[in-house]
């Protein structure tokens, strides 16, 4: 989608493919071996890393482990019995660990088995793989087994020391190394040949998981990646919203993490320019930012210093060239997100200032610019960026980069400044600033990311006085498709200190239009902001939500609408709950038969409402009292 200036070129008023990142135009981005000075093992040396004869996994053995895993999954919930089964199965695994790990089906089963494994059996399997560690780490199936083993650490490190001692006493001939020693041994081997592991397509996954485990933090952006056999739907994650899961690790892990951090500094050029290796550095920055911020700052300085020392571009800082590069720009995005506020402001003044508009219009560089906006926390820096970028908002939208505008609006929300100015600029960009009556249409325009003339299919000559907003025309038209970025834009605006104009536009929507918004996968989240924003008063919230009266059954029978109705119900007073229940009760049978509606009926206690009204009211009053008591406790 896009918006354009008021001109004959109306195509520019509509964004085209706005949220996708255009980074696949020039191949993989990874230089061919031998041309970049990147160390590669000779073919003979690589052959030496593999076992002389790769062990074969017989169909009988594969069938046995498949049946054993199925039995383990349906085993009784009793921890001791399930653990005993896992021990017995994994004891059989030890002798065929390499064969299982390097077989596609066997690898998938071994990954699941490790999820059930107690501490010592996992150490035994790991020890069985260790003589061929490099081969397994760089094998397309074996790599996922190593990742799965590493990802068991948060679970296994929580076990009390007494349990470990009991295991050592019970198991004869236990592994010679503890789990901590095995992890440190893997880290030492990776450290000895760091460039090789980081540059290998499969080995880099092990490095990235190892960095997280050593730091005691699992990144959400990486948790969907280990299992190569999973569907693409399962693997999709949001890199922008990276919420780490922390767990306690031994001090030796952090010491080894520092060693790996130093390895990046030795060959910083490779990790900036090589696509596969760059992923490892990006993960390292996130982990170090959480656990060792000083080392993170050193790495950031090394990246910026290296890029700043390259040949200058024609239009200013040499860093600008790398902001437009597929590989290095992704690394710079991560650098921007972890930089300290003072360093971020210095980076802006040294490299970004005066270039924001050209970066915003570039198909690649607009993404690092979005991360810069995401990282801003000081009013001073936001003022500098806002002053430079705000005049170009409409042109940026016309280029199909609404993410930049959404990031700027989010920065205004977060910092708490320039909110009125950015809203006025949005009105102008979407051609609903003048006449003022058009402002009532801002919500449909923002949601669809369409200019006023495009949304309402008007033919206006260039230079003509904009027509007044026609309420009849607006109410008769169905709401257009809600975009993800349009929904985010509305959510940020509703969290502004004064969201009155946006709420007025929401109140102008008809019941069917508001229903369409609630039933939309993206639009339903706008209601989350309406219900939770501290800037929206109870009166304003009620004015918007009362329009949904008569639409409750349709909401309840919708995947996303039912979620919205549940949220409305949770915050509704007793009187509003009676109205909702009465309307739903008229279609009780329809709700019970609907896959989403029957959950709503149960949440509302609709059967009790229809048959025992007094008991229902007493139950709802009790729930309301508990909610008020909990709210007062939380406020205190």
From Swiss-Prot:
Pfam family, one: PUF_NOP9
Keyword presence, Nucleotide-binding: no
Protein name per UniProt: Nucleolar protein 9
SMART domains on file: Pumilio
Keywords tagged on the record: Phosphoprotein, Repeat, RNA-binding
Keyword RNA-binding: yes
Disulfide bond positions: none
Family: Belongs to the NOP9 family.
SUPFAM superfamilies per the UniProt record, alphabetical: ARM repeat
Region (Disordered): 1-41, 222-242
Positions carrying Phosphoserine: 7
Polar residues composition-biased segments: 228-237
């Amino acid at each position: 989608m896009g918006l354009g200036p008021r001109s004959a070129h109306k195509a520019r008023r509509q964004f085209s493919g706005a949220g996708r990142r255009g980074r696949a135009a020039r191949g993989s981005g990874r230089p061919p071996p031998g041309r970049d000075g990147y160390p590669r093992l000779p073919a003979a040396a690589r052959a030496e890393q593999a076992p002389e004869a790769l062990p074969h996994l017989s169909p009988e053995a594969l069938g046995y482990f498949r049946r054993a895993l199925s039995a383990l999954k349906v085993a009784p919930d009793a921890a001791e019995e399930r653990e005993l089964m896992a021990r017995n199965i994994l004891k059989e695994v030890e002798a065929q660990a390499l064969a299982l790990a390097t077989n596609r089906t066997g690898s998938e089963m071994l990954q699941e088995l490790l999820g059930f494994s107690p501490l010592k059996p996992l150490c035994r399997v790991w020890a069985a793989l260790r003589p061929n560690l490099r081969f397994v780490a760089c094998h397309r199936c074996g790599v996922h087994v190593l990742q799965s083993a590493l990802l068991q650490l948060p679970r296994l490190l929580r076990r009390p020391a007494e349990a470990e001692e009991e295991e050592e006493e019970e198991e004869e001939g236990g592994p010679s190394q503890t789990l901590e020693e095995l992890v440190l041994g893997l880290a030492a081997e990776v450290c000895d040949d760091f460039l090789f592991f980081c540059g290998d397509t499969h080995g880099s996954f092990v490095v990235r998981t190892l960095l997280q485990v050593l730091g005691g933090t699992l990144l959400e952006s990486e948790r969907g990646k280990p299992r190569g056999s999973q569907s693409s739907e399962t693997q999709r994650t949001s890199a922008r919203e990276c919420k780490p899961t922390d767990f306690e690790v031994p001090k030796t892990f952090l010491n080894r993490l520092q060693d790996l951090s130093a390895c990046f500094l030795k060959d910083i050029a490779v990790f900036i320019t090589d696509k596969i290796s760059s992923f490892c550095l990006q993960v390292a920055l996130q982990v170090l930012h959480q656990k060792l911020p000083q080392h993170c700052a050193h790495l950031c300085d090394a990246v910026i210093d290296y890029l700043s020392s390259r040949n200058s571009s024609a239009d200013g800082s040499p860093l600008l060239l790398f902001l437009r590069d597929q590989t290095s720009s992704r690394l710079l995005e991560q650098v921007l997100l972890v930089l300290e506020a003072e360093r971020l402001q210095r980076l802006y003044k040294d490299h970004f200032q005066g270039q924001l508009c050209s970066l915003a219009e570039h198909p690649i560089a607009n993404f690092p610019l979005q991360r810069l906006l995401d990282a801003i926390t000081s009013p001073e820096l936001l003022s500098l960026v806002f002053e430079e970028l705000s005049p170009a908002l409409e042109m940026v939208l016309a280029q199909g980069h609404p993410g930049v505008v959404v990031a700027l609006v989010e920065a205004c929300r977060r910092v708490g400044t320039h909110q009125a100015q950015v809203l006025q600029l949005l009105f102008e960009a979407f051609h609903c600033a003048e006449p003022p009556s058009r402002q009532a249409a801002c919500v449909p325009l923002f949601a669809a990311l369409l200019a006023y003339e495009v949304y309402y299919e008007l033919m206006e000559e260039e230079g003509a006085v904009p027509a007044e907003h026609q309420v009849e025309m607006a109410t008769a038209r169905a709401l257009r498709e809600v975009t993800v970025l349009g929904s985010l834009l509305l959510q940020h605006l509703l969290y502004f200190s004064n969201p009155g104009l946006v709420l007025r536009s929401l109140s102008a929507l008809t019941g069917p239009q508001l229903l369409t918004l609630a039933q939309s996968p993206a639009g339903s989240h706008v209601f989350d902001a309406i219900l939770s924003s501290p800037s929206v008063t109870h009166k304003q919230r009620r004015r918007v939500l009362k329009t949904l009266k008569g639409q409750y059954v349709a909401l309840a029978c919708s995947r996303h609408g039912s979620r919205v109705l549940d949220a409305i119900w949770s915050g509704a007073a007793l009187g509003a709950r009676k109205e909702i229940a009465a309307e739903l009760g008229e279609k009780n049978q329809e709700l019970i038969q609907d896959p989403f509606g029957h959950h709503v009926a149960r949440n509302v206690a609709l059967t009790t409402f229809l048959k025992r009204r007094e008991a229902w009211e007493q139950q709802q009053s009790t729930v309301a009292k508990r909610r008020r008591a909990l709210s007062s406790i939380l406020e205190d």
